[in-house]
């Protein structure tokens, strides 16, 4: 046992914890100047995943936008897990005059909504009992009532939320169980061009495609229509191309991103090799050839027309000191989300921080969100409100935030 090495590791961990506490204190002190909107809520259990629903209602007379969010739970051992639907009322920024933060609660340590006329309302409106942790949750683009999850038990599940009451039942009963993976996973993506089609990826190194049209009510189970296996490395993420029925990209622990076409006998048509394990992939919704890859060390942009060299890489741009950021920050991207309103803007999350990038600028780093005290599990851009972002972390917190100050 190397006592000296253990002590060095302990001191390094304590240093990082103190640094995070100092960063969070400064963030809380300055938050009133940094955001047009900031909502923080402490959840009962951490959520590993978050997604805005693609349906929103505008209440014009109240200047309110009624949104919904999908969340999960990562409960303690022996405690039940739930798929959760949350209602969120936000101010309509086109009708409301915004004011700096006035609603910080000293007792709870929570920040509320920041408009002059409205407080933002958040509540869990529906909970559905789930088998295992909700590793990932996504709704069908063509029908937001149909929800898919990836579970820590290895299976994927489909729920029609209209078939469940607001309070959870005592028995776990999904509408469909997707049977095929042998280990847990986090890769999950619906096909935006083909109704009822989705793809999953897991630690068993498999990528499976599913067609819900093949579902039989007699068994309530479904087997995959396609099975792809590249190597023995865990596949961490997968996403269909938003404008193409047959294309998707997946990434794995070996740092390989494989571009796949399910019409081909050899499904993988091209690959990109990174120097670190890859955890996230996202296609740009506006630029058909552009996609982003994220690892714990860097964020990379690639163009499908030229896979010989990345368009942008944070580790390379840091080496020439073009990005003016503290050296302790790791500009990786274990979770990524492109803006639906601005083609050059993406948010990445790594460790306790979220980074907003605008690649239409010479210095692309626009904003750093330092409000979380635990590792950020997932980030998601609001599809309706430009620059509004949701993030969830291991500190049990959900943050809804819209930056006010853009740092150049």
UniProtKB/Swiss-Prot annotation:
It is found in: Cytoplasm; Nucleus. Disruption phenotype: Viable. The keyword Transport does not apply. Pfam families: CAF1C_H4-bd, WD40. SMART domains: WD40. The keyword Nucleus applies. WD repeats lie at residues 129-169, 180-220, 230-269, 273-312, 330-369, 371-408. Keywords: Chaperone, Chromatin regulator, Cytoplasm, DNA damage, DNA repair, DNA replication, Nucleus, Repeat, WD repeat. InterPro entries: Histone-bd_RBBP4-like_N, WD40/YVTN_repeat-like_dom_sf, WD40_repeat_dom_sf, WD40_rpt, WD_repeat_RBAP46/RBAP48/MSI1. It comes from the Eukaryota. One of its GO terms (biological process) is DNA repair-dependent chromatin remodeling. GO terms for cellular component: CAF-1 complex; chromatin; cytoplasm; cytosol; nuclear replication fork; nucleus. GO terms for molecular function: H3-H4 histone complex chaperone activity; histone binding. Acts as a component of the histone chaperone complex chromatin assembly factor 1 (CAF-1), which assembles histone octamers onto DNA during replication and repair. CAF-1 performs the first step of the nucleosome assembly process, bringing newly synthesized histones H3 and H4 to replicating DNA; histones H2A/H2B can bind to this chromatin precursor subsequent to DNA replication to complete the histone octamer. Plays a role in the maintenance of heterochromatin. Belongs to the WD repeat RBAP46/RBAP48/MSI1 family. Component of chromatin assembly factor 1 (CAF-1), composed of pcf1, pcf2 and pcf3. Interacts with pcn1/PCNA during S-phase. Interacts with swi6 at the G1/S-phase transition and early S-phase, but not in the G2 phase. The CAF-1 complex interacts with histone H3-H4 dimers. PANTHER family: WD40 REPEAT FAMILY. This is Histone-binding protein pcf3. It comes from Schizosaccharomyces pombe (strain 972 / ATCC 24843). The gene is pcf3.
